[in-house]
């Protein structure tokens, strides 16, 4: 057999291998989610969050550096990246089964004993055990590996989205706690000054023991808040170090929370299904479903005959010097067919497992879409509520601070008691602390909205 004949045979085998597949058609998914966003979700002609780079969304340069450090050093993200490399390698291994494995061989056979010593030399090129994929078993296994690779890659993008959002939220939390600590420490100093005055008046008989006790209560309350916030700030720093993969430069840490840190989170423009399908976790679930579908095709193909081809062409000679002389050519062609007859129900069990895996993947895909809709709807609803809370909280702080100033003036004029002044100070202090907590919740929810809409994958939009 000439080499050209062997090549023609291999080409024919490859063509036949691409003829059919027993995988079922991809299942149409119609998850039970509303066709529109909740009424409180304001619509706007804005870009999708997935198209907004995280450097465009997080506008503070210090925060950008912290996020960049986290993306470079975070161990969880590193594991996700390595999983992508592993899945890519597994796909390449599986894909290699779709083409013949051609190998060059060389052999020397020397025999002796009572008879004279004989030598035989051979060299050739051949194909070993190439499966003629008439029913799509190998192709479906390759498709399943490809979809698994796509799913792992989508999970890697989802890991990056989560890391960006968690790092930004932790950074803002540190800033809010740092600002609350400054307010608490300033309040402690003010209350301590008031306590010294109250003690002096009490010694002169100018105030009651109740007034002195209430002042001490305010001092200890503020000291407790300051101690708690110092501990919380240390925990915030540790959380940031874990996310960033190492200690941060103190110059990158915020000392307050500012509304200018974030760009406004874009509300979703379009139908829920269109927006949610851009989320990497939903994309990963979809690829898992496609992989499970392909595995059904491979399990079905296992019921049919398997045809393998082995062939070689080369040269053989009793002398090494004459190995490639005329008349020394040798060839072999060995087709093999395997027909499953009895395997104790193994093939049916494998098919049942593949069908169950597909049904599980379908349920998980539907759940991921429903969960994505709920997360987005919750963030949209909370966005409106927190905007209202922030506006109301600002008015409360302004009113409390004005009441504190008026109470101080009336106390200085002898019109109000010291207890009334202490109540006004306590109200102003609590209002300031509550305002910072509301601002943090407002910005954290904007980060959540950005994340659940699929934002944070690109560095720049």
Q: Would you name each region that the model predicts?
A:
Residues 2-72, 146, 230-277, 283, ...:
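Terminal intrinsically disordered/low-complexity segments used for targeting and assembly
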Residues 43-45, 49-58, 63, 105-130, ...:
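Small/polar, glycine/serine/threonine/aspartate-rich low-complexity segments that form flexible
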Residues 67, 122-124, 171, 216, ...:
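Membrane-embedded beta-strand positions in outer-membrane beta-barrel channels/transporters
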Residues 78-96, 105-107, 290:
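Short, acidic/charged, Gly/Pro-enriched secondary-structure junctions
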Residues 79, 95, 132-160, 210, ...:
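Sec/SRP-type N-terminal targeting helices
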Residues 138, 154-271, 382, 427-428, ...:
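Periplasmic alpha-helical coiled-coil/stalk elements that build and connect Gram-negative outer-membrane
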Residues 188, 195, 221-251, 299, ...:
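Short segments within alpha-helical structural elements
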């Amino acid at each position: 057999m000439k080499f050209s004949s062997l090549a023609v045979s291999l080409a024919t085998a490859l063509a036949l291998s691409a003829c059919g597949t027993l995988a079922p058609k991809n299942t149409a998914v119609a998850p039970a989610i509303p066709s529109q966003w909740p009424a409180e979700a304001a619509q706007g002609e804005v870009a999708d969050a997935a198209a907004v780079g995280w450097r465009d969304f997080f506008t503070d340069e210090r925060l950008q550096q912290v996020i960049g450090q986290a993306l470079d050093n975070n161990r969880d993200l590193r594991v996700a990246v390595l999983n992508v490399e592993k899945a890519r390698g597994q796909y390449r291994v599986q894909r290699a089964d779709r083409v013949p494995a051609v190998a060059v061989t060389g052999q020397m056979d020397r025999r002796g004993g009572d008879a004279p010593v004989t030598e035989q030399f051979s060299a050739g090129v051949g194909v070993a055990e190439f499966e003629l994929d008439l029913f799509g078993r190998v192709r479906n296994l390759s498709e399943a590996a490809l979809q698994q690779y796509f799913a792992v890659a989508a999970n890697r993008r989802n890991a990056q989205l989560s890391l960006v959002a968690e790092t930004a939220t932790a950074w803002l939390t540190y800033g809010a706690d740092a600002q609350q600590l400054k307010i608490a420490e300033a309040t402690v100093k003010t209350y301590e000054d008031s306590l010294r005055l109250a003690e002096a008046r009490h010694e002169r008989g100018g105030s009651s023991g109740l007034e002195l006790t209430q002042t001490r209560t305010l001092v200890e309350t503020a000291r407790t808040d300051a101690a708690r916030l110092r501990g919380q700030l240390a925990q915030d720093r540790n959380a940031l170090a874990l996310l960033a993969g190492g200690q941060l430069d103190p110059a990158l840490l915020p000392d307050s929370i500012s509304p200018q840190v974030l760009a406004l989170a874009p509300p979703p423009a379009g139908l829920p299904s269109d927006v949610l399908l851009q989320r990497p976790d939903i994309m990963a679930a979809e690829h898992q479903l496609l992989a499970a579908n392909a595995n059904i095709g491979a399990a079905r193909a296992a019921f049919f005959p398997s045809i393998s081809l082995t062939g070689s062409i080369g040269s053989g000679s009793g002398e090494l010097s004459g190995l490639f002389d005329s008349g020394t050519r040798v060839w072999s062609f060995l087709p093999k067919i395997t027909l499953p007859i009895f395997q104790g129900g193994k093939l049916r069990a494998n098919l049942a497992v593949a069908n169950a895996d597909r049904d599980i993947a379908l349920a998980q895909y539907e759940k991921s879409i429903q969960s994505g809709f709920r997360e987005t709807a919750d963030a949209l609803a909370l966005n409106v509520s927190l905007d209202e809370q922030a506006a109301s909280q600002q008015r409360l702080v302004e009113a409390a601070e004005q009441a504190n100033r008026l109470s101080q003036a009336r106390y200085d004029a002898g019109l109000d008691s010291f207890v009334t002044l202490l109540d006004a100070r306590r109200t102003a202090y609590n209002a300031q602390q509550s305002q910072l907590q509301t601002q943090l919740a407002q910005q954290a929810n904007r980060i959540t909205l950005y994340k659940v809409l699929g934002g944070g994958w690109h560095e720049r939009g």
